[in-house]
């Protein structure tokens, strides 16, 4: 046969519309915007090639192996409604292309060099189907939803949190004081801001000590289990682990990590440590909008959320639908359910391109955070349901009477909404009424209602289908 040098069309090798996908394949849905003049089949095949075994020219060493078991295949192409120059390319990757238990390796292949590819104007990974065989190579979340509820002894309602503000500039002792006041007032958790690591005005060890003191004092006074997400994110993995170890020595229930800026390798390491040592792991998604906000390029957040469930985390920030940060309702609900449910049906109206079976990998609690306050409580309770964490930063600390009354207001609002829902009332329609009724017997809630009655963050969402 001989070796035929030269450049040949990708579609001859990598576009295979007759391919039957295997249960073990990783499936990807890409939104492709080709350069003018590049046909869809060629662009789709190019994506499959560049993210698997292909290179730009025929190489002699192809003859030393069979590409068939290893190549990515573009097996289906469909137009995007309302967009002339875009289409969705479906690509199947054989399982053997990926290292077991490594989100890092999976992303290096699937969203690696191919995103800088010249024949494409833009490329966005919309969804991934992770096969059972690959899911089973991951530990996943350190504990999951049920274990967390059992550790905290809190059932039948969403959990309440609060990010301590001002996020930068407080001394450790004043920071601990704010933590204590919020927990004492009735919150379940307080949170280090994602940018709080170990800065000159507050070194991590001092913060950990004062926060631990705040946790134990508020626990003793309320009889409830309390937690503060101690941010273990650091400049090196060794420093990160040092912080996690110190948190364990203090006996606190939960630590935190910024998984995108910290990286998947660091995150998976920390998740393994957390399972071995009984720590819950709260995950913040700082940097996600750099990757997921553009509609035609990058990666959708639902893919980042799936990756986090594999890498490991017990809480993941997932937008709010009602606050100050991006999130269309149906789409947000799609990636609220993805991390926490065992089985998610394909549903294009929610942006879900594939049915995903998580085969008993523990679930992750979605966290609603960003510009929310007591008036949003009915909507949040209805949209997110019991298995969620609702975080009010400014919505707690901005209370006119102080932090503890701010916490009281949120807890009263939540308990009122949960009770109303359990009595069969419609939170979507009667939400404001429920909050008003509750505020009659809670002066703290009444004051909060007064402060935030006019606040709205109304901009059209970017994340549309």
UniProtKB/Swiss-Prot annotation:
**Catalysed transformations (reactions):** 2 (2R)-3-phosphoglycerate + 2 H(+) = D-ribulose 1,5-bisphosphate + CO2 + H2O; D-ribulose 1,5-bisphosphate + O2 = 2-phosphoglycolate + (2R)-3-phosphoglycerate + 2 H(+)
GO cellular component terms listed in the entry, alphabetical order: chloroplast
Cofactor stoichiometry and binding? Answer: Binds 1 Mg(2+) ion per subunit.
Q: How is it modified after translation?
A: The disulfide bond which can form in the large chain dimeric partners within the hexadecamer appears to be associated with oxidative stress and protein turnover.
What one GO molecular function would you report for this record? ribulose-bisphosphate carboxylase activity
User: Which regions span the lipid bilayer?
Assistant: none
What biological process terms from GO does the record include?
photorespiration; reductive pentose-phosphate cycle
Q: Provide the binding site for Mg(2+).
A: 191, 193-194
- Give the residues the record marks as binding substrate: 113, 163, 167, 285, 317, 369
- Please name the HAMAP family in this protein's record: RuBisCO_L_type1
What the record says about family reads: Belongs to the RuBisCO large chain family. Type I subfamily.
- Its recorded name reads Ribulose bisphosphate carboxylase large chain
- Native organism is Morella cerifera
Gene name on record? rbcL
């Amino acid at each position: 046969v001989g070796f035929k040098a030269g450049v040949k069309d990708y579609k001859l090798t990598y576009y295979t519309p007759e391919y039957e996908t295997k249960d073990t394949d990783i499936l990807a849905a890409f939104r492709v915007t080709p350069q003018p003049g590049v046909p869809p089949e060629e662009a789709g095949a190019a994506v499959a090639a560049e993210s698997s075994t292909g290179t730009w020219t025929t190489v002699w060493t192809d003859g030393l192996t069979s590409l068939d078991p290893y190549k990515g295949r573009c097996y289906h192409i469909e137009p995007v409604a309302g967009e002339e120059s875009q289409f969705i390319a479906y690509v199947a990757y054989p399982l053997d292309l990926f290292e077991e238990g490594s989100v890092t390796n999976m992303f290096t292949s699937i969203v690696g060099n191919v995103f800088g590819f010249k024949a494409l104007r833009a490329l966005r990974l919309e969804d991934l189907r992770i096969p059972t065989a690959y899911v089973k190579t991951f530990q996943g979340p350190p504990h999951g939803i049920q274990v967390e509820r059992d550790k905290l002894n809190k059932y039948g309602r969403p959990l309440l949190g609060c990010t301590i503000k001002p996020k930068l500039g407080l001394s450790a002792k004043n920071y601990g004081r704010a933590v204590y006041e919020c927990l004492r007032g009735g919150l379940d958790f307080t949170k280090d801001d994602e940018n709080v690591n170990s800065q000159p005005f507050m070194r991590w060890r001092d913060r950990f000590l004062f926060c631990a003191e705040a946790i134990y004092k508020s626990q003793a006074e309320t009889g409830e289990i309390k937690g503060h997400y101690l941010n273990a994110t650091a400049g090196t993995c060794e420093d990160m682990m040092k912080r996690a170890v110190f948190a364990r020595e203090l006996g606190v229930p939960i630590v935190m990590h910024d998984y995108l800026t910290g990286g998947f390798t660091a995150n998976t390491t920390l998740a393994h440590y957390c399972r071995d040592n009984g720590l819950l792991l709260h995950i913040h998604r700082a940097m996600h909008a750099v990757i997921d906000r553009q509609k035609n390029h990058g990666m959708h957040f639902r893919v980042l959320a799936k990756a986090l469930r594999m890498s490991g985390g017990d809480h993941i920030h997932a937008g709010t639908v009602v606050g100050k940060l991006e999130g269309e309702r149906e789409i947000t609900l799609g990636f609220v359910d993805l991390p926490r449910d065992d089985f998610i049906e394909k549903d294009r109206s929610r942006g879900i391109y594939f049915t995903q079976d998580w085969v008993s990998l523990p679930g992750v609690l979605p966290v609603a955070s960003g510009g929310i306050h007591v008036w949003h409580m009915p909507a949040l309770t209805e949209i997110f349901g019991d298995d969620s964490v609702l975080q009010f930063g400014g919505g707690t600390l901005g209370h006119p009477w102080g932090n503890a009354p701010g916490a009281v207001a949120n807890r009263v609002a939540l308990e009122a909404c949960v009770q109303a829902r359990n009595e069969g009332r419609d939170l979507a329609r009667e939400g404001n009424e429920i909050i008003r009724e509750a505020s009659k017997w809670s002066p703290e809630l009444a004051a909060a209602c007064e402060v935030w009655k006019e606040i709205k963050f109304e901009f059209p969402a970017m994340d549309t289908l």
